[in-house]
Amino acid sequence: MQEFDIIVVGGGHAGCEAALASARMGMKTAIFTISLDTIGVMSCNPSLGGPAKSHLAREIDALGGEMGRNIDKTFIQIRVLNTRKGPAVRSLRAQADKMAYANEMKKTLEHTDNLSVIQGMVSELVVEEENGKKIIKGIKIREGLEYKAKAVIIATGTFLRGLIHIGEINFSAGRMGELSSEELPLSLEKIGLKLERFKTGTPTRIDGRTIDYSVLEEQPGDKSQVLKFSNRTKDEDALSRRQISCYIAHTNEKVHEIIRNAKERSPLFNGTIQGLGPRYCPSIEDKIFRYPDKNQHHLFLEREGYETNEIYLGGLSSSLPVDVQEEMLKNIKGFENAKIMRYAYAIEYDYVPPEEIKYTLESRTVENLFLAGQINGTSGYEEAGAQGLMAGINAVRKLRNEEPVILDRADSYIGTLIDDLVSKGTNEPYRMFTARSEYRLYLREDNADLRLTKLGYELGLVPEEEYQRVEKKRKDVKIITEILAKTNVGPSNPRVNEILLKRGENPIKDGSTLLELLRRPEVSFEDIKYISEEIRGIDLQGYDHDTTYQVEITVKYEGYINRALKMIEKHKSMENKKIPVDIDYDDLKTIPKEAKDKLKRIKPINIGQASRISGVSPADIQAILIYLKMRGN
């Protein structure tokens, strides 16, 4: 019987990050997947990034994860969203060559030391009882083999009792054309895990040769600047990638009428589908009935790769019958002759309510069993990858008897994601938004490396060279800011008012520092560099764009950032008030039973976490603080 330190079940985005983290930290690791051909597959949209999701991807990269580097090697378009808004919500988004992304991820797994990649459907978890505790001991696969493990990470995506719906037709599948896992959920229930149902969906894929692009709005990529998800990607490699345009189309009243007439044939509305779907990624029929006054909805045409004609039609996710899908498509401008290559469908699947896991992503029921990705009730590749990385890290540290890594919501979007899941739970597939973070002006995608690379380095996931690069950037930002603060300029420097007038700013009559000039909304760091060329002894050349952009953001938004840092300081004081593991909530007579039950189940490790649990009031928190003070904590 083969034996591993850690076994990962599932080869999706969570599973890949978990397996790589475990193996790179020195553990003998195996990743099991139903099919080796679908490792790292993008089940729905062939893209990474977008608001808050790019923040997660950048944080994964800063901690030493793989997702950012993988998309940089395989993107076919990249651009920045929300450029007219503030830096907190600006986000990078890349369109992937779907097949290349999966192949590159598989190659990375296969070339990683300490990692075995095995095809096999896991049918059962081997759990034993020791000293009254359930402890994971390994797995069994349908092929009849058993494997021992000290820890197991479950990252099964939509495959647990997956049920696909297309109109009146439904059938078992984990993804279209792939087997669902029917035995593993039974094993999870047998060992005491609670399972519930969620639903998601995916749109039609169209033959790109049958679309009339001349009547659509083009969305080109951005080749004017270096754009990349990973700081370890070379600038020249990112710039050299060939980019393909995306396009925008729209539905119309005729399409909406077709959908309204087919309402009773939609499993979403006729009672066939029981699981709740993602509110922020609704099907087209959901949008039509939820927003009856809207006479059109955007559709996004995104190529699935260099070597395919398949076009992903974002915004047209559906569970309607195929004849209705055909009819509504032909009534969209530009799609009169369009041919469908893959039909849209909805899928229901099992998930474990996230209140069942600890902040480390370990199960509360079975020791050394970790859960990551959609099984925890989330939606999205980046959300899955973030959980996979943290599950891998914490599984390793648990086996080494080391302190767990629990990221604070004030330090990262990953921390916000996990804290939201465990403290609040979710009644729909959870998707990350910048609005979910109260510290979003500090938690920007551009400073993810400054926030988290040191931790990734200490964990052994970030190489020395990358760590030193980030530390140099930190030092350079400070040096440049100090130079700007102490360098005075006046109207005698002809370039000062030249730039100010060109940017629509008021010219100066008296002296100013370069720092004060940079605070002006329309003045960029490039402008400051231009002005500084006329100042003897000042050299602002030779710094990379990443560093100078960081200077510009911190200078322009200094007041807001300082306000956010004060909020974080206040938040940290709550997070630093630890709750003893042996606390007996029954001793707190003033706390209602409902709140006590939640506190007992979730077991918050500090006052901050306790305060965010749904159903726990400020009065309950005050009672806990008084109790801890009386105990001398």
Curated annotation (Swiss-Prot):
It comes from the Bacteria. Its cofactor is FAD. GO terms for molecular function: flavin adenine dinucleotide binding. FAD binds at residues 10-15, 122, 181, 374. One of its GO terms (biological process) is tRNA methylation. It is found in: Cytoplasm. NAD(+) binds at residues 277-291. GO terms for cellular component: cytosol. Keywords: Cytoplasm, FAD, Flavoprotein, NAD, tRNA processing. Belongs to the MnmG family. PANTHER family: GLUCOSE INHIBITED DIVISION PROTEIN A, PROTEIN MTO1 HOMOLOG, MITOCHONDRIAL. Homodimer. Heterotetramer of two MnmE and two MnmG subunits. NAD-binding protein involved in the addition of a carboxymethylaminomethyl (cmnm) group at the wobble position (U34) of certain tRNAs, forming tRNA-cmnm(5)s(2)U34. This is tRNA uridine 5-carboxymethylaminomethyl modification enzyme MnmG 2. It comes from Fusobacterium nucleatum subsp. nucleatum (strain ATCC 25586 / DSM 15643 / BCRC 10681 / CIP 101130 / JCM 8532 / KCTC 2640 / LMG 13131 / VPI 4355). The lineage of its organism: Bacteria, Fusobacteriati, Fusobacteriota, Fusobacteriia, Fusobacteriales.
